[in-house]
């Protein structure tokens, strides 16, 4: 070991200091794509979620999806989008198979919140929707279409903070991108799919496809169940027109799919159902906005920015405090335009991982080939911890984690310029007051589960992971945003209501 230390590799190996930084405590979720574990950040004492993605390169299509999501989550840094904190450096540049991604912690997802709570207040609905639209405003400003918005892809915590995740189906729109190529792999969840996607209705798609999904999610908050649970495409269109009425002749004439055009043209005329009848007891202003979001014709839907100016958000929205992203460079997604081999995707993912290892990035850019490491990496140690804990889970035991074996002193990760505190951290609606530090679940006044810490997504999405939360103490937020959010919270004490205790 001493001889190796003298070879100049300690500085290289010191990038693996994060191997000692995270101590895996338990496996908390398993899916077809990997394992999610809770871990402790030994530098801060806070807990994080670590997602291990197995055999990333077994299928190139899956590896490309992971590459796309890692890249987008790096480029789209916003309080309402789930954040990758770190990615472990693999032990070999050209031979690694698994990826370990460290995420911020969220307790549950919007699907579970809606399912477990039949007494969410209008204030909850408003705040959830505001954050969702604010995140989509940022995403769309970057010319990104999410394409798979649904409650399970909206993570949530006990403070009613929500964050958009699962960008595996997302695409960046460029002016010269052929729409036929752009949308050929669209397979998003049918219940939240815009009508123009149900039958390839229109030749040019817009961010309005995401706005429709936001409307479906908002309606589900109000109803407590999905609005359009279609069994197939035809049934989906029937459910839409049952509520919204038959589309206009002008809308039908612009549909490019002949079968869909003929089906809607021959459909019996259906009257529009008043939303006040479909959603009895709902806030009239909420229903007015919902009608705009669920316009059958995409040109009639508001943009996310326009929706945020709706009177429904009076006293809450402030366009000056809503960040706007710059369009993403076409070069970032050049790989979408060519056929990739397994080694191509591996190299591209490795390049993304280096974004979280600044010193290694410099060596990489200088042409230093570090394909064979002299020391076991943090990933190697995590493999042992995961294997140990998974074995206990398989046997039904409450397995204790292996003791860490320090091979070097922990070193602080180099902070990137984009590492900033969440400017909305102080603006929250408590779902429950009195939770003891360290508890892993939240209950409402009826002592029923509110946000279960065991509701983990089984998604191939790298961001679809939830773990037990012990919210880390954040540094002071940016002054302007903090003041704004505190003013909003102080100014509407009853509006930001708590559930009954």
Curated annotation (Swiss-Prot):
Family annotation (InterPro entries): Kinase-like_dom_sf, MAP_kinase, MAP_kinase_CS, Prot_kinase_dom, Protein_kinase_ATP_BS
EC number: 2.7.11.24
Statement: the UniProt record of this protein carries the keyword Nucleotide-binding: yes
PTM note: Dually phosphorylated on Thr-184 and Tyr-186, which activates the enzyme.
Coiled coil: none
Reaction(s) this enzyme catalyzes, per UniProt: L-seryl-[protein] + ATP = O-phospho-L-seryl-[protein] + ADP + H(+); L-threonyl-[protein] + ATP = O-phospho-L-threonyl-[protein] + ADP + H(+)
Catalytic residues, chain numbering: 148 (proton acceptor)
Modification type Phosphothreonine: residues: 184
Activity regulation behaviour: Activated by threonine and tyrosine phosphorylation.
Record's GO cellular component terms: cytoplasm; nucleus
Entry keywords, A to Z: ATP-binding, Kinase, Nucleotide-binding, Phosphoprotein, Serine/threonine-protein kinase, Transferase
GO annotation, biological process: intracellular signal transduction
Molecular-function GO term, any one: protein serine/threonine kinase activity
Chain residue ranges for the region called Disordered: 477-501
Record-listed Phosphotyrosine modification sites: 186
Start and end residues of each Protein kinase domain: 22-313
Domain text: The TXY motif contains the threonine and tyrosine residues whose phosphorylation activates the MAP kinases.
Family statement drawn from the similarity comment of this UniProt entry: Belongs to the protein kinase superfamily. CMGC Ser/Thr protein kinase family. MAP kinase subfamily.
Record's protein name: Mitogen-activated protein kinase 16
Name of the coding gene: MPK16
């Amino acid at each position: 070991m001493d001889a190796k230390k003298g070879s100049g590799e300690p500085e290289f190996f010191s990038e693996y200091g994060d191997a000692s930084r995270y101590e895996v405590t338990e496996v908390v979720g398993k899916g077809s794509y990997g394992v999610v574990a809770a871990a402790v950040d030994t530098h801060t004492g806070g807990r994080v979620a670590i997602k291990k993605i197995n055999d990333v390169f077994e299928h190139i299509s899956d590896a490309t999806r992971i590459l796309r999501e890692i890249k987008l989550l790096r480029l789209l840094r916003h309080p309402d989008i789930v954040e990758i904190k770190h990615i472990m450096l693999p032990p070999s540049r050209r031979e690694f198979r698994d990826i370990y991604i460290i995420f911020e912690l969220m307790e549950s997802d919007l699907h579970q919140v809606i399912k477990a709570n039949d007494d969410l207040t209008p204030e909850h609905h408003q705040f959830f929707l505001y954050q969702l639209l604010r995140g989509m405003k940022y995403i769309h400003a970057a010319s990104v279409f999410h394409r798979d918005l649904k409650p399970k892809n909206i993570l949530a915590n006990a403070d009613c903070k929500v964050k958009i995740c699962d960008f595996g189906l997302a695409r960046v729109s460029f002016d010269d991108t052929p729409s036929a190529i752009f949308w050929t792999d669209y397979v998003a969840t049918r219940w939240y799919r815009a009508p123009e996607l149900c039958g390839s209705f229109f030749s040019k798609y817009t961010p309005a496809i995401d706005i429709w999904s936001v409307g479906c999610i908002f309606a589900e908050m109000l109803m407590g169940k999905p609005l359009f649970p279609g069994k197939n495409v035809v049934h989906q269109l029937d459910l839409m027109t049952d509520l919204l009425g038959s589309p206009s002749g002008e809308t039908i004439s612009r549909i490019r799919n002949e079968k869909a055009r003929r089906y809607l043209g021959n459909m019996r005329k259906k009257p529009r159902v008043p939303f006040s009848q479909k959603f009895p007891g709902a806030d009239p202003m909420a229903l007015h906005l919902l009608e705009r979001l669920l316009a059958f014709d995409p040109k009639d839907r508001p943009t996310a920015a326009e929706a945020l100016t709706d009177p429904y958000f009076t006293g809450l929205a402030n366009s000056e405090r809503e960040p706007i992203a710059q369009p993403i460079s076409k070069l970032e997604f050049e790989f979408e335009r060519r056929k990739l081999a397994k080694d191509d995707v591996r190299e591209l993912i490795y390049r993304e991982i280096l974004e979280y290892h600044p010193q290694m990035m410099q060596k990489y850019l200088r042409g230093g080939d570090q394909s064979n490491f002299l020391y076991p990496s943090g990933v190697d140690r995590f493999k042992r911890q995961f294997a140990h804990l998974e074995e206990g889970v398989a046997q039904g035991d409450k397995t204790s984690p292996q003791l860490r074996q320090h091979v070097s002193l922990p070193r602080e990760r180099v902070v990137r310029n984009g590492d900033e505190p969440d400017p909305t951290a102080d603006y929250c609606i408590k779902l429950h007051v009195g939770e003891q530090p360290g508890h892993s679940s939240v209950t409402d006044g009826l002592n029923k589960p509110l946000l279960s810490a065991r509701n983990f997504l089984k998604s191939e999405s790298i961001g679809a992971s939830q773990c037990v939360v012990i919210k880390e103490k954040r540094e002071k937020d940016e002054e302007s945003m903090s003041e704004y959010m505190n003013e909003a919270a102080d100014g509407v004490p009853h509006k930001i209501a708590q559930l009954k205790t």
